[in-house]
Amino acid sequence: MAGAGLIAIKRRIKSINNTKKITKAIGLVATSKLRKARQKLELNNAYYSSVNEIMNGILADKNLEKGIYFKDNGVNKKLYIVITSDSGLCGGFNGNVIAKTLETISGDRENSVIITVGKKGRTYLKKFKIDSIAEFVEIPEIPTLKEVKAILEKALNLYMNKEISEINVVYTHFVSSVKQEAKVKKILPITMEEDSEQTSTFVEFEPDKNIVLEGISELYLKQTLLNLMLNSKTSEESARMTAMDGATSNANDLLDKLNLQYNRIRQSSITQEISEIVGGAQAQE
Protein backbone atom coordinates (compact mmCIF):
# COMPACT_ATOMS: atom_id res chain seq x y z
CA MET A 1 0.00 0.00 0.00
CA ALA A 2 2.86 2.36 0.87
CA GLY A 3 4.47 1.70 -2.52
CA ALA A 4 1.26 2.61 -4.37
CA GLY A 5 0.94 5.79 -2.30
CA LEU A 6 4.52 6.81 -3.06
CA ILE A 7 4.00 6.30 -6.80
CA ALA A 8 0.83 8.45 -6.74
CA ILE A 9 2.60 11.25 -4.86
CA LYS A 10 5.60 11.14 -7.23
CA ARG A 11 3.25 11.47 -10.21
CA ARG A 12 1.54 14.44 -8.60
CA ILE A 13 4.88 16.09 -7.79
CA LYS A 14 5.96 15.66 -11.42
CA SER A 15 2.68 17.12 -12.70
CA ILE A 16 2.89 20.15 -10.40
CA ASN A 17 6.53 20.73 -11.37
CA ASN A 18 5.52 20.78 -15.05
CA THR A 19 2.71 23.24 -14.32
CA LYS A 20 5.07 25.41 -12.27
CA LYS A 21 7.46 25.65 -15.22
CA ILE A 22 4.58 26.94 -17.38
CA THR A 23 3.32 29.51 -14.84
CA LYS A 24 6.87 30.74 -14.22
CA ALA A 25 7.52 31.13 -17.96
CA ILE A 26 4.23 32.98 -18.52
CA GLY A 27 5.03 35.21 -15.54
CA LEU A 28 8.46 36.10 -16.93
CA VAL A 29 6.98 36.94 -20.34
CA ALA A 30 4.26 39.06 -18.67
CA THR A 31 6.93 40.92 -16.68
CA SER A 32 8.78 41.77 -19.89
CA LYS A 33 5.57 42.86 -21.64
CA LEU A 34 4.54 44.92 -18.61
CA ARG A 35 7.82 46.82 -18.70
CA LYS A 36 7.34 47.70 -22.38
CA ALA A 37 3.65 48.59 -21.98
CA ARG A 38 4.34 50.75 -18.94
CA GLN A 39 7.07 52.69 -20.74
CA LYS A 40 4.72 53.33 -23.66
CA LEU A 41 1.91 54.37 -21.31
CA GLU A 42 4.14 56.85 -19.48
CA LEU A 43 5.22 58.44 -22.76
CA ASN A 44 1.61 58.61 -23.95
CA ASN A 45 0.44 60.09 -20.64
CA ALA A 46 2.69 63.10 -21.18
CA TYR A 47 1.39 63.70 -24.72
CA TYR A 48 -2.23 63.02 -23.79
CA SER A 49 -1.96 65.48 -20.91
CA SER A 50 -0.96 68.22 -23.38
CA VAL A 51 -3.83 67.37 -25.74
CA ASN A 52 -6.24 67.30 -22.80
CA GLU A 53 -5.03 70.71 -21.62
CA ILE A 54 -5.66 72.21 -25.07
CA MET A 55 -9.16 70.71 -25.16
CA ASN A 56 -10.01 71.98 -21.67
CA GLY A 57 -8.86 75.45 -22.74
CA ILE A 58 -11.31 75.32 -25.65
CA LEU A 59 -14.12 74.01 -23.44
CA ALA A 60 -13.53 76.82 -20.93
CA ASP A 61 -14.39 79.42 -23.59
CA LYS A 62 -18.14 79.88 -23.08
CA ASN A 63 -18.48 82.13 -26.13
CA LEU A 64 -17.07 79.60 -28.58
CA GLU A 65 -19.49 77.64 -30.78
CA LYS A 66 -18.20 74.10 -30.28
CA GLY A 67 -19.87 71.95 -32.95
CA ILE A 68 -21.29 68.41 -33.16
CA TYR A 69 -18.63 66.69 -31.04
CA PHE A 70 -19.64 68.77 -28.01
CA LYS A 71 -23.45 68.63 -28.19
CA ASP A 72 -26.03 66.09 -27.04
CA ASN A 73 -27.89 64.87 -30.13
CA GLY A 74 -31.02 63.94 -28.16
CA VAL A 75 -30.89 60.16 -28.73
CA ASN A 76 -31.51 57.85 -25.75
CA LYS A 77 -29.07 55.06 -26.61
CA LYS A 78 -25.52 55.01 -25.25
CA LEU A 79 -22.52 53.15 -26.63
CA TYR A 80 -20.07 51.30 -24.39
CA ILE A 81 -16.69 50.22 -25.77
CA VAL A 82 -15.66 47.38 -23.44
CA ILE A 83 -11.90 46.74 -23.38
CA THR A 84 -10.84 43.23 -22.33
CA SER A 85 -8.01 40.85 -23.26
CA ASP A 86 -7.62 38.36 -26.08
CA SER A 87 -6.09 35.73 -23.80
CA GLY A 88 -6.68 34.56 -20.24
CA LEU A 89 -4.53 33.73 -17.20
CA CYS A 90 -4.72 37.34 -15.99
CA GLY A 91 -6.56 36.94 -12.69
CA GLY A 92 -9.66 39.07 -12.24
CA PHE A 93 -8.76 41.54 -15.00
CA ASN A 94 -11.58 40.61 -17.40
CA GLY A 95 -14.08 39.78 -14.67
CA ASN A 96 -13.70 43.25 -13.15
CA VAL A 97 -14.28 44.97 -16.51
CA ILE A 98 -17.40 42.89 -17.19
CA ALA A 99 -18.70 43.50 -13.66
CA LYS A 100 -18.23 47.26 -14.19
CA THR A 101 -20.06 47.03 -17.53
CA LEU A 102 -23.00 45.12 -16.04
CA GLU A 103 -23.19 47.55 -13.12
CA THR A 104 -23.20 50.54 -15.49
CA ILE A 105 -25.88 49.28 -17.88
CA SER A 106 -28.01 47.46 -15.29
CA GLY A 107 -30.64 50.20 -15.14
CA ASP A 108 -31.04 50.64 -18.90
CA ARG A 109 -29.95 47.57 -20.88
CA GLU A 110 -32.37 48.27 -23.72
CA ASN A 111 -30.68 51.58 -24.49
CA SER A 112 -27.13 50.27 -24.10
CA VAL A 113 -25.11 49.38 -27.20
CA ILE A 114 -21.91 47.35 -26.83
CA ILE A 115 -18.68 47.15 -28.82
CA THR A 116 -16.14 44.67 -27.43
CA VAL A 117 -12.38 44.90 -27.71
CA GLY A 118 -10.69 41.55 -26.99
CA LYS A 119 -12.00 37.99 -27.31
CA LYS A 120 -12.75 37.64 -23.60
CA GLY A 121 -15.26 40.49 -23.62
CA ARG A 122 -17.32 38.80 -26.30
CA THR A 123 -17.20 35.44 -24.45
CA TYR A 124 -18.11 36.88 -21.04
CA LEU A 125 -20.99 39.06 -22.25
CA LYS A 126 -22.58 36.21 -24.20
CA LYS A 127 -22.93 34.36 -20.89
CA PHE A 128 -25.12 37.24 -19.72
CA LYS A 129 -27.06 37.21 -23.01
CA ILE A 130 -25.62 40.56 -24.07
CA ASP A 131 -24.74 40.89 -27.75
CA SER A 132 -22.21 43.29 -29.21
CA ILE A 133 -22.72 45.14 -32.49
CA ALA A 134 -19.00 44.95 -33.32
CA GLU A 135 -15.98 43.04 -32.05
CA PHE A 136 -12.30 43.94 -32.34
CA VAL A 137 -9.88 41.13 -31.53
CA GLU A 138 -6.18 40.28 -31.80
CA ILE A 139 -5.10 43.64 -30.44
CA PRO A 140 -1.27 44.02 -30.53
CA GLU A 141 0.85 43.90 -27.37
CA ILE A 142 1.16 47.68 -27.66
CA PRO A 143 -2.06 49.20 -29.13
CA THR A 144 -1.51 51.76 -31.89
CA LEU A 145 -3.53 54.43 -33.68
CA LYS A 146 -4.35 51.84 -36.35
CA GLU A 147 -6.58 49.91 -33.92
CA VAL A 148 -7.90 53.14 -32.41
CA LYS A 149 -8.99 54.50 -35.81
CA ALA A 150 -10.87 51.28 -36.67
CA ILE A 151 -12.78 51.31 -33.38
CA LEU A 152 -13.51 55.05 -33.49
CA GLU A 153 -14.70 54.87 -37.10
CA LYS A 154 -17.42 52.41 -36.11
CA ALA A 155 -18.37 54.38 -33.00
CA LEU A 156 -18.44 57.78 -34.71
CA ASN A 157 -20.58 56.45 -37.57
CA LEU A 158 -23.18 55.44 -35.00
CA TYR A 159 -22.96 58.88 -33.38
CA MET A 160 -23.16 60.84 -36.65
CA ASN A 161 -26.14 58.75 -37.79
CA LYS A 162 -27.85 59.54 -34.46
CA GLU A 163 -28.06 55.88 -33.44
CA ILE A 164 -26.40 56.73 -30.12
CA SER A 165 -26.02 59.87 -27.99
CA GLU A 166 -22.88 58.97 -26.06
CA ILE A 167 -19.65 57.04 -26.48
CA ASN A 168 -18.34 55.56 -23.24
CA VAL A 169 -15.30 53.37 -22.67
CA VAL A 170 -15.14 50.66 -19.99
CA TYR A 171 -11.45 50.10 -19.33
CA THR A 172 -8.92 49.32 -16.60
CA HIS A 173 -6.97 52.26 -15.22
CA PHE A 174 -3.38 51.38 -14.34
CA VAL A 175 -2.50 52.81 -10.92
CA SER A 176 0.50 50.64 -10.05
CA SER A 177 1.79 47.09 -10.43
CA VAL A 178 -0.38 46.03 -7.51
CA LYS A 179 -3.45 48.17 -8.18
CA GLN A 180 -5.67 48.51 -11.25
CA GLU A 181 -9.22 49.90 -11.34
CA ALA A 182 -12.08 49.15 -13.74
CA LYS A 183 -13.59 52.49 -14.79
CA VAL A 184 -16.06 54.06 -17.23
CA LYS A 185 -15.10 57.22 -19.15
CA LYS A 186 -17.40 59.20 -21.44
CA ILE A 187 -15.43 60.44 -24.45
CA LEU A 188 -18.30 61.85 -26.52
CA PRO A 189 -19.86 64.40 -26.31
CA ILE A 190 -16.57 65.98 -25.29
CA THR A 191 -16.77 67.62 -21.85
CA MET A 192 -14.28 69.26 -19.52
CA GLU A 193 -12.47 66.98 -17.07
CA GLU A 194 -14.17 67.08 -13.64
CA ASP A 195 -10.91 67.89 -11.85
CA SER A 196 -9.82 70.49 -14.39
CA GLU A 197 -9.06 74.00 -13.09
CA GLN A 198 -8.77 75.46 -16.59
CA THR A 199 -9.97 79.06 -16.86
CA SER A 200 -11.39 80.74 -19.92
CA THR A 201 -8.72 81.90 -22.33
CA PHE A 202 -8.75 83.70 -25.63
CA VAL A 203 -8.44 81.17 -28.47
CA GLU A 204 -7.60 82.32 -31.98
CA PHE A 205 -8.10 79.95 -34.91
CA GLU A 206 -6.22 80.01 -38.21
CA PRO A 207 -7.10 79.59 -41.01
CA ASP A 208 -10.66 78.46 -40.18
CA LYS A 209 -12.30 77.90 -36.81
CA ASN A 210 -14.44 74.92 -37.88
CA ILE A 211 -11.56 73.09 -39.57
CA VAL A 212 -9.26 73.59 -36.57
CA LEU A 213 -11.92 72.57 -34.04
CA GLU A 214 -12.76 69.43 -35.99
CA GLY A 215 -9.08 68.51 -36.24
CA ILE A 216 -8.43 69.08 -32.54
CA SER A 217 -11.58 67.15 -31.62
CA GLU A 218 -10.58 64.13 -33.71
CA LEU A 219 -7.04 64.25 -32.29
CA TYR A 220 -8.46 64.40 -28.76
CA LEU A 221 -10.76 61.40 -29.34
CA LYS A 222 -7.97 59.30 -30.86
CA GLN A 223 -5.51 60.11 -28.11
CA THR A 224 -8.10 59.54 -25.39
CA LEU A 225 -9.03 56.09 -26.67
CA LEU A 226 -5.36 55.21 -27.24
CA ASN A 227 -4.54 56.24 -23.68
CA LEU A 228 -7.38 54.12 -22.28
CA MET A 229 -6.31 51.11 -24.36
CA LEU A 230 -2.71 51.51 -23.18
CA ASN A 231 -3.94 51.70 -19.59
CA SER A 232 -5.89 48.48 -20.11
CA LYS A 233 -3.01 46.67 -21.80
CA THR A 234 -0.58 47.64 -19.03
CA SER A 235 -3.12 46.56 -16.41
CA GLU A 236 -3.65 43.24 -18.21
CA GLU A 237 0.05 42.35 -18.18
CA SER A 238 0.36 43.48 -14.56
CA ALA A 239 -2.60 41.28 -13.58
CA ARG A 240 -1.14 38.34 -15.53
CA MET A 241 2.26 38.75 -13.88
CA THR A 242 0.65 38.85 -10.43
CA ALA A 243 -1.58 35.85 -11.18
CA MET A 244 1.32 33.74 -12.46
CA ASP A 245 3.57 34.74 -9.54
CA GLY A 246 0.79 33.66 -7.20
CA ALA A 247 0.30 30.38 -9.06
CA THR A 248 4.04 29.64 -8.95
CA SER A 249 4.15 30.43 -5.23
CA ASN A 250 1.16 28.15 -4.59
CA ALA A 251 2.85 25.39 -6.59
CA ASN A 252 5.96 25.70 -4.43
CA ASP A 253 3.87 25.48 -1.25
CA LEU A 254 2.07 22.40 -2.56
CA LEU A 255 5.36 20.78 -3.59
CA ASP A 256 6.77 21.35 -0.10
CA LYS A 257 3.75 19.59 1.44
CA LEU A 258 3.87 16.71 -1.03
CA ASN A 259 7.62 16.21 -0.58
CA LEU A 260 7.13 16.15 3.19
CA GLN A 261 4.28 13.66 2.80
CA TYR A 262 6.38 11.55 0.43
CA ASN A 263 9.34 11.46 2.85
CA ARG A 264 7.11 10.56 5.81
CA ILE A 265 5.48 7.66 3.95
CA ARG A 266 8.86 6.51 2.68
CA GLN A 267 10.39 6.71 6.15
CA SER A 268 7.42 4.86 7.62
CA SER A 269 7.74 2.18 4.94
CA ILE A 270 11.47 1.74 5.60
CA THR A 271 10.89 1.58 9.36
CA GLN A 272 8.20 -1.05 8.85
CA GLU A 273 10.48 -3.13 6.60
CA ILE A 274 13.30 -2.96 9.17
CA SER A 275 10.90 -4.00 11.91
CA GLU A 276 9.71 -6.96 9.84
CA ILE A 277 13.29 -8.05 9.11
CA VAL A 278 14.30 -7.76 12.77
CA GLY A 279 11.14 -9.56 13.84
CA GLY A 280 11.77 -12.37 11.34
CA ALA A 281 15.38 -12.78 12.50
CA GLN A 282 14.34 -12.95 16.13
CA ALA A 283 11.72 -15.57 15.32
CA GLN A 284 14.36 -17.82 13.77
CA GLU A 285 16.65 -17.71 16.83
Swiss-Prot record:
PANTHER family: ATP SYNTHASE GAMMA CHAIN, ATP SYNTHASE SUBUNIT GAMMA, MITOCHONDRIAL. It comes from Clostridium novyi (strain NT). F-type ATPases have 2 components, CF(1) - the catalytic core - and CF(0) - the membrane proton channel. CF(1) has five subunits: alpha(3), beta(3), gamma(1), delta(1), epsilon(1). CF(0) has three main subunits: a, b and c. This is ATP synthase gamma chain. InterPro entries: ATP_synth_F1_ATPase_gsu (IPR035968), ATP_synth_F1_gsu (IPR000131), ATP_synth_F1_gsu_CS (IPR023632). Produces ATP from ADP in the presence of a proton gradient across the membrane. The gamma chain is believed to be important in regulating ATPase activity and the flow of protons through the CF(0) complex. Belongs to the ATPase gamma chain family. One of its GO terms (biological process) is proton motive force-driven plasma membrane ATP synthesis. It comes from the Bacteria. It is found in: Cell membrane. It is a peripheral membrane protein. It holds the Pfam family ATP-synt.
